[in-house]
Amino acid sequence: MAKKKQAKQAEVNIGMVGHVDHGKTSLTKALTGVWTDRHSEELRRGISIRLGYADCEIRKCPQCGTYTTKPRCPNCLAETEFLRRVSFVDSPGHETLMATMLSGASLMDGAILVIAANEPCPQPQTKEHLMALEILGIDKIIIVQNKIDLVDEKQAEENYEQIKEFVKGTIAENAPIIPISAHHEANIDVLLKAIQDFIPTPKRDPDATPRMYVARSFDINKPGTEIKDLKGGVLGGAIIQGVFKVGDEIEIRPGIKVTEGNKTFWKPLTTKIVSLAAGNTILRKAHPGGLIGVGTTLDPYLTKSDALTGSVVGLPGTLPPIREKITIRANLLDRVVGTKEELKIEPLRTGEVLMLNIGTATTAGVITSARGDIADIKLKLPICAEIGDRVAISRRVGSRWRLIGYGTIEG
């Protein structure tokens, strides 16, 4: 068998989901060697943009069959063979995660649901995240029973039975449950094999019209840089389809707010791709998988401090329209998941303010007319979206925004 060439870019995105403090970030660290919550360091280093994305190589030992992320087998020290490169999306804040997950922006091809063995199952966010996977139809799921080093065998078995009971009748009913200790890196090899077996790389169409969601944007120039040495603005995001190449002319929507006379409107930006990077690897072209840094000729003032987060990038003339109002058909959940009380969700009503997530965009909206499950919404910030796109809907419950369902754009 010919050796598989090592990939420069990840080919599949796997979401790390689960209750707070159940070990998502530690597990990402055990798999990739990267702590994903490290924003200030990330900005200091410039362009290694990973929005809590971290990649790892899955490798297999040809001698003893061990799965590992290392070039040499930890068991027999033979040289290992490269299988594929995967990217883990470890989203930090759980409430924003819920909305982002639901709007499909995190573009997960599969998910690892992390459940701690030393707490009763399910915890509120465990329920909330599994519901999000259900709504999104993400059915390539592996359940990780973490922190088994903190419980005895009997407790581990009881927790395992609780997990089985919890997932019965859900999208994760047949998901494998793998006991591990992320802290001691125990059973990580078994998890790597499960990722290979249960979360395949989806078939992607390289000829599809390229499109990308912008998750971050920055100015990478140091203060005091000479004008001749200034670099253009940088976009960090996830490609959802097609292939972008260095040299491509691109359009960014909704763009920037422009006032001419007494009229204010949003004007799309056009620019050129001058560089592409996945982590620290420079690319000539980029496909879906992992987070991609896109260097442009834009004035860095336009991209600083995440100013273009929520935008959509494509080839000129191929993007959906900019919408300042939308009509959605809402699918509301029965109860507010993730709260202790699990309050009943009331229907949408005219005049109410909602928080909406579409792609990587977040905007507030006021319902101008609600009739049954159809609502007309005026948006505070415009979005670039197609008919049929999904919108995550959150409502103020007490002092925080709570996910109450999703909608489909109808107009």
From Swiss-Prot:
UniProt-annotated binding residues for Mg(2+) 1: T25, S48
Catalysed reaction equations from the record: GTP + H2O = GDP + phosphate + H(+)
Molecular functions (GO terms): GTP binding; GTPase activity; metal ion binding; translation elongation factor activity; translation initiation factor activity; tRNA binding
Segments of this protein annotated with the region G4: 146-149
PROSITE patterns linked to this entry: G_TR_2
Binding-site positions, Mg(2+) 2: D21, G46
Record: residues binding Zn(2+): C61, C64, C73, C76
Region of interest called G1, as start-end residue ranges on this chain: 18-25
Cofactor(s) listed in the protein's UniProt record: Mg(2+)
GO BP annotations, alphabetical order: formation of translation preinitiation complex
Domain called tr-type G: residue spans: 9-203
Family annotation (CDD domains): eIF2_gamma (cd01888), eIF2_gamma_II (cd03688), eIF2_gamma_III (cd15490)
Protein name in the entry: Translation initiation factor 2 subunit gamma
